[in-house]
């Protein structure tokens, strides 16, 4: 990975990043800053034994920062070409955090449902990739090995949490002024019940519909 955020109780967080000043690097930086700021706030609020973020919620502040940066880009450009570029990158963020992570999660499920060996892991991955991209995309056989570089696979069923977190982040973005406290959760709180206090319901279709409505809105502007 090109970046890493590490937090310690009662000490400021550390971010390790190979920052070269590109727009992609900026997105990576704001993502890691989301983790870092949440860690810093929690260090002030909780005792040592309570310090930490439930894994289920850890990607909310990081992806919220990506949304904020994407919104800044599309609302601050003046040239149509710049707007189109920023909009496509925004759409790519949605694709990466939602559809790609759904693809990875389905891949994990299939691995548990099958006897696997070095020959069929890649085959399973390519079949799922072809399912998601459809007949209009001809995937190179090398896509069978893409799974090897996915660090989230080293943490059991981590990828789906990008989907839930991005959905929650989009919901929080749409009501940001009233949801600020939602990022102060400690590791011993029940994450789903805690977030319901701020009207963020992971079991409600309406939360995810806001995300898909945003995607459709962006698609309409670039048609």
Task: Label the model's feature ranges.
Residues 34-48:
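Catalytic Zn2+-binding segment of zinc metalloproteases
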Residues 8-30:
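Short pre-active-site segment immediately N-terminal to the catalytic Zn-binding motif
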Residues 20-24, 34-35, 69-70, 167, ...:
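Short, glycine-/Ser/Thr-/acidic-enriched flexible segments
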Residues 14-18, 46-55, 86-92, 112, ...:
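Short beta-alpha connecting loops at secondary-structure transitions
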Residues 1-14, 212, 219:
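Contiguous, non-catalytic segments that form substrate-binding/exosite surfaces or channel walls
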Residues 29, 37, 75-77, 98-101, ...:
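C-terminal, non-catalytic "cap/extension" segments appended to globular domains
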Residues 42, 52-82, 89-92, 96, ...:
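Post-HExxH zinc-binding segment in Zn-dependent metallohydrolases
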Residues 27-37, 56-57, 61, 68, ...:
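Internal glycine-rich alpha/beta core junctions
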């Amino acid at each position: 990975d090109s970046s890493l955020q590490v937090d310690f109780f009662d000490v400021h967080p550390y971010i390790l990043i190979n920052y070269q000043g590109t727009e992609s690097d900026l997105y990576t930086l704001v993502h890691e800053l989301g983790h870092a700021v949440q860690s810093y706030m929690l260090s002030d609020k909780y005792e040592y034994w309570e310090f930490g973020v439930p894994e289920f919620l850890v990607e909310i502040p990081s992806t919220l920062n990506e949304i904020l940066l994407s919104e800044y880009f599309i609302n601050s450009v003046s040239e149509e070409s710049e707007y189109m570029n920023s909009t496509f990158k925004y759409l790519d963020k949605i694709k990466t955090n939602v559809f790609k992570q759904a693809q990875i999660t389905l891949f994990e499920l299939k691995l548990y449902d099958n006897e696997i060996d070095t020959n069929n892991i890649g085959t399973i991955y390519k079949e799922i990739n072809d399912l998601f991209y459809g007949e209009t995309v001809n995937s190179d056989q090398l896509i069978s090995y893409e799974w090897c570089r996915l660090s989230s696979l080293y943490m059991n069923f981590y990828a789906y949490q990008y989907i839930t977190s991005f959905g929650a982040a989009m919901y929080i973005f749409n009501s940001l002024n009233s949801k600020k406290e939602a990022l102060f959760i400690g590791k011993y709180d029940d994450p789903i019940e805690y977030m319901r206090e701020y009207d963020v319901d992971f079991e409600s279709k309406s939360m995810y519909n806001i995300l898909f409505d945003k995607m459709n809105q962006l698609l309409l502007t670039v048609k």
